[in-house]
């Protein structure tokens, strides 16, 4: 990861974290819906 500013902006951390959380929840519910279960 290229860190040019010396410090990662807080909004960037929040955005990435939000995307990851939504992605994990989406994958979990999609897996449960398609019958894969909790294969994580």
Swiss-Prot record:
Q: This protein's superkingdom?
A: Eukaryota
- Give the transmembrane ranges: 8-28
Instruction: Please give the SUPFAM superfamilies that the UniProt record associates with this protein.
Output: Photosystem II reaction center protein J, PsbJ
**UniProt KW Plastid keyword:** yes
Stated name of the protein: Photosystem II reaction center protein J
* GO BP annotations listed: photosynthesis
Which family does the record claim for this protein? Belongs to the PsbJ family.
Role played: One of the components of the core complex of photosystem II (PSII). PSII is a light-driven water:plastoquinone oxidoreductase that uses light energy to abstract electrons from H(2)O, generating O(2) and a proton gradient subsequently used for ATP formation. It consists of a core antenna complex that captures photons, and an electron transfer chain that converts photonic excitation into a charge separation.
Q: Which region is the signal sequence?
A: none
């Amino acid at each position: 990861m290229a860190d040019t500013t010396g410090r990662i902006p807080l909004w960037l951390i929040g955005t990435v974290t939000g995307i990851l959380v939504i992605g994990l929840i989406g994958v979990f519910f999609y897996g449960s819906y398609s019958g894969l279960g909790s294969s994580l």
